[in-house]
Amino acid sequence: LIVIFYSYIEKLFTPIQNLAEQFNVLQSALAAGERIYDVLNIKSELEDAEDAIEIDHLDGEIEFKNVWFAYVGEDWILKDVSFKVKAKENVAFVGATGSGKTTILSLIVRNYDIQKGQIFIDGLDIKKYQIASLRKHIGQMLQDVFLFSGTVESNITLRSEEITSDIVKEACRFVNADKVIDKLPNKYNEIVRERGKNFSSGERQLISFARVVSHKPNIMILDEATSNIDTETEALIQDSLKKMMNIGTMLIVAHRLSTIQHCDKIIVLKKGKIIESGTHLELLDKRGHYYL
């Protein structure tokens, strides 16, 4: 009887103990949820002007005019930067870490507002465009590709109803992503694990290229997107980049010579200032900072 009694006592307390443990997990989840909502409810410092216009189409001409920018106070990251990018031109920005390359790209999508100067897209100050509308026409390809849990196709469409399966497949063929996807057991319905853990860095980058092309942006931004690619997909990525350079304005930050040498213009930055610009061959002939 004593053995049976202790056996029943154990069966009684085990569910209670499990419930107590789950309660701790629930409390942690509620606390995490509150922090997430706090972040989501942060109001953006950037707001549309009352007369901001919605964009139907961009040609892709970009101009920086005497731009000064600092993240904090007057610790200037960009100092009196001026340059012009023609529509459908391919321009690369090179320079040491901290020279302002990525900052320039962030300002074009208006992640921040500048302190001095002006930034124009298609001849109009970017502050006169609706922020969401502007970003809709700019495709970004970054070093760290974020893939969501879901199918390959949903990661390319980003749940947009305007992008059909045919558009997805066409975009994948264009950027050579189909050569990777067609080898998958379920092809476009293959499940992507969290953050794309079941794909190599190069494969994730090809999927991000297809994502951008399928949304048909007028301006494309490539920020160190070729820095961590694997050797197996490097040739596919370089070939897809050459194709993408012909469909819109492209701005590139990269350290790989193979990525930037075919650009129409290369802008060299040093400590927030433009020190020289030209084509790859022109800059080599100058034997300046780019040559070194």
Question: Which role does the model predict for each range below?
Answer:
Residues 1-7:
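Membrane-water interface of transmembrane alpha-helices in multipass transporters/channels
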Residues 48, 55-292:
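ABC-type nucleotide-binding domain
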Residues 26, 43-46:
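Signal-transduction coiled-coil helices of two-component systems
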Residues 38, 45, 157:
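Conserved E/DxxT/N motif and adjacent residues on the DHp alpha2 helix
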Residues 14, 28-31, 41, 131, ...:
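Short, conserved catalytic or interaction motifs in soluble domains
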Residues 11-39:
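Cytosolic ends of transmembrane helices, especially the final helix of ABC transmembrane type-1 domains
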Residues 6, 13, 135:
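Conserved catalytic core of two-component sensor histidine kinases
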Residues 4, 21, 34-38, 169-173, ...:
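Generic alpha-helical structural context detector
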